[in-house]
């Protein structure tokens, strides 16, 4: 793709998201979603092959269905309230339809099936945009309509998303699919807290984006797409590979890494709201995520996959691509736990 075209497409994606975030009128929000969706299709099809075409088609159909459902909910709400304003959701059916549409855009269970398939079919760069930037717009709308959301519906979706995110990643060898299932689980944690403490959801989303960005950038740095290629990279770039493994453990929520903060605070907040069973179940199912990350770490760092004799550990540094953003991203993705007492302002 030529640089001027890429710049225009990326600017359109950013503009679409900004329109969604800054609007309080449902029609403008819908336009922002459509701009965002149509602009990311060429990014997903950047590497032109049947897998990328299939992934783009699946993404387009899912997002178009979600947009249609959202507009239907907005129309029903308009008939009852007579207003396009986002804060006036007076009809419960309209609220359920809007919530369903936004969760479909985010990839929450039971609308999660497109996320692993689309992520696996595109390049690492496209997958990174899909699992980070594309989550911001729907989450910002959920944040704004959180007082009107049906809590029971969202809690059910959250619990099943955490379960699906852990269960689906267990037998995966493709790193992009592992990241996709991790994304589903993280979206579940955010959905669980959004009706009780929306500000905490923003903290969770920020940390999730930081950790996912860092992990994908390291994947791109050493061109790893499978667990086997990651284990071979252990011989070639031990430092980069060990950073990937630490980031994955952080994504799994292992203390004392940054990924533990949102899980800890969400469980604490739900318990304060007299909910015991749901946070307990979520904590238990989150162990599935942690298990497949630990298994990946063990198989990569502590066991040696079959390889040829010329793939022994290289101790000298090779020339690698410069990545100025990576060090601060890695530090914030792994070492923020000591700052947790400062987050008491969220209560």
Swiss-Prot record:
Superkingdom, taxonomy of origin: Eukaryota
Broad EC category: translocase
Catalysed reactions, as listed in the record: a ubiquinone + NADH + 5 H(+)(in) = a ubiquinol + NAD(+) + 4 H(+)(out)
Gene Ontology molecular-function annotations: NADH dehydrogenase (ubiquinone) activity
Membrane topology field: Multi-pass membrane protein
One GO CC annotation: mitochondrial inner membrane
Functional summary from the UniProt entry: Core subunit of the mitochondrial membrane respiratory chain NADH dehydrogenase (Complex I) which catalyzes electron transfer from NADH through the respiratory chain, using ubiquinone as an electron acceptor. Essential for the catalytic activity and assembly of complex I.
Family: Belongs to the complex I subunit 2 family.
Protein name per UniProt: NADH-ubiquinone oxidoreductase chain 2
Species whose genome carries this gene: Canis lupus
Higher taxonomy: Eukaryota, Metazoa, Chordata, Craniata, Vertebrata
């Amino acid at each position: 793709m030529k640089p001027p075209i890429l710049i225009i497409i990326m600017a359109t994606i950013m503009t679409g998201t900004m329109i969604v975030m800054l609007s309080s009128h449902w029609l403008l929000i819908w336009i922002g979603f459509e701009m965002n969706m149509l602009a990311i299709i060429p990014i997903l099809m950047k590497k032109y092959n049947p897998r990328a075409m299939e992934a783009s088609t699946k993404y387009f159909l899912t997002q178009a269905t979600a947009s249609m459902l959202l507009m239907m909910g907005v129309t029903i709400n308009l008939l009852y309230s007579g207003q396009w304003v986002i804060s006036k959701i007076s009809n419960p059916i309209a609220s359920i339809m809007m919530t369903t549409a936004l969760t479909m855009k985010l990839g929450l269970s039971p609308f999660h099936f497109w996320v692993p398939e689309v992520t696996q079919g595109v390049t690492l760069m496209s997958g990174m945009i899909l699992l980070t930037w594309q989550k911001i717009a729907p989450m910002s709308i959920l944040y704004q309509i959180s007082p009107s959301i049906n809590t029971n519906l969202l809690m059910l979706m959250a619990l099943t998303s955490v379960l699906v995110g852990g269960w689906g990643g267990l037998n995966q060898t493709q790193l992009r699919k592992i990241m996709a299932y991790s994304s589903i689980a993280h979206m579940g944690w955010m959905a669980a807290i959004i009706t009780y403490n929306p500000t905490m959801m923003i903290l969770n989303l920020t940390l999730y984006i930081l950790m996912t960005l860092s992990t994908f950038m390291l994947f791109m740095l050493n061109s790893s797409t499978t667990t086997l290629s990651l284990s071979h990279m252990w011989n070639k770039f031990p430092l980069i590979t060990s950073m990937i493994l630490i980031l994955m453990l952080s994504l799994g929520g292992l203390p004392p890494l940054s990924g533990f903060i949102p899980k800890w605070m969400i469980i604490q907040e739900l318990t304060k709201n007299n909910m015991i069973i749901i946070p307990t179940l979520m904590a238990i199912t989150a162990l599935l995520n942690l298990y497949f990350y630990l298994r990946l770490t063990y198989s990569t760092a502590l066991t040696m996959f079959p390889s040829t004799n010329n793939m022994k550990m290289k101790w000298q540094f090779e020339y690698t691509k410069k990545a100025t953003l990576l060090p601060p991203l890695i530090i914030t993705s792994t070492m923020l736990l000591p700052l947790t007492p400062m987050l008491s302002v969220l209560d």
